């Protein structure tokens, strides 16, 4: 089983990102779960969401404490949240930042998802770009399924733009780390 923990801030779409990733895994023929961590979140406050992906039925119904991957939508969280807490020894981090030299003690993949979101969407909402970036560095889900999940989640032009943001991030990660 592959377990992914998303870190973001309220209003950044971390919960939606976890759901899109799970839906993409489903379209790829896998079993999946996506769920948020509910607390006293408010816009801008740190939030977490989770996705599980497996080739067989998932029976666990608890928070993910030892993820295989961590996806960080906002690098400023590094100042206040231990985003790598519990990350498995061979785990990896995908983080939205312009810095390429982050040392988090784990394999770290960086992408300027904010820049992509601003270019493609016109707003700094990075959730779909981060799912595309994750697909690009891991291959756990296909970009075709990611785009299909996005188009199911967001209708019309909004869906098309978000699918484009995911594809741009996916291709950037393939170019950078492929």
Swiss-Prot record:
Keyword Transit peptide set for record: no
Pfam family, one: POR
Keywords associated with the record: Oxidoreductase
The EC number(s) this enzyme carries: 1.2.7.1
Single annotated GO MF: pyruvate synthase activity
Signal peptide: none
Catalytic activity of the protein: 2 oxidized [2Fe-2S]-[ferredoxin] + pyruvate + CoA = 2 reduced [2Fe-2S]-[ferredoxin] + acetyl-CoA + CO2 + H(+)
The protein's assembly and partners: Heterotetramer of one alpha, one beta, one delta and one gamma chain.
Protein name: Pyruvate synthase subunit PorC
Organism the protein comes from: Methanocaldococcus jannaschii (strain ATCC 43067 / DSM 2661 / JAL-1 / JCM 10045 / NBRC 100440)
Gene: porC
């Amino acid at each position: 089983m592959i377990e992914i923990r998303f870190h973001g801030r309220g209003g950044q779409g971390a919960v939606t990102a976890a759901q899109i990733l799970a839906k993409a895994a489903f379209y790829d023929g896998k079993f999946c779960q996506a769920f948020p961590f509910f607390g006293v979140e408010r816009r801008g406050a740190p939030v977490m969401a989770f996705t599980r992906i497996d080739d067989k039925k998932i029976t666990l119904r608890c928070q993910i404490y030892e993820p295989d991957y961590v996806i960080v939508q906002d690098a400023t969280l590094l100042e206040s949240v231990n985003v790598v807490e519990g990350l498995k020894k061979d785990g990896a981090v995908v983080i939205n930042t312009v810095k390429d030299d982050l040392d988090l003690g784990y394999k770290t993949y960086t992408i300027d998802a904010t820049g992509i979101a601003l270019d493609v969407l016109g707003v700094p909402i990075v959730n779909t770009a981060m799912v595309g970036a994750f697909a690009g560095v891991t291959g756990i889900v296909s970009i075709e399924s990611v785009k299909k999940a996005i188009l199911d989640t967001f209708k019309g032009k909004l869906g098309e733009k978000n699918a484009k943001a995911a594809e741009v991030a996916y291709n950037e990660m393939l170019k950078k780390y492929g």
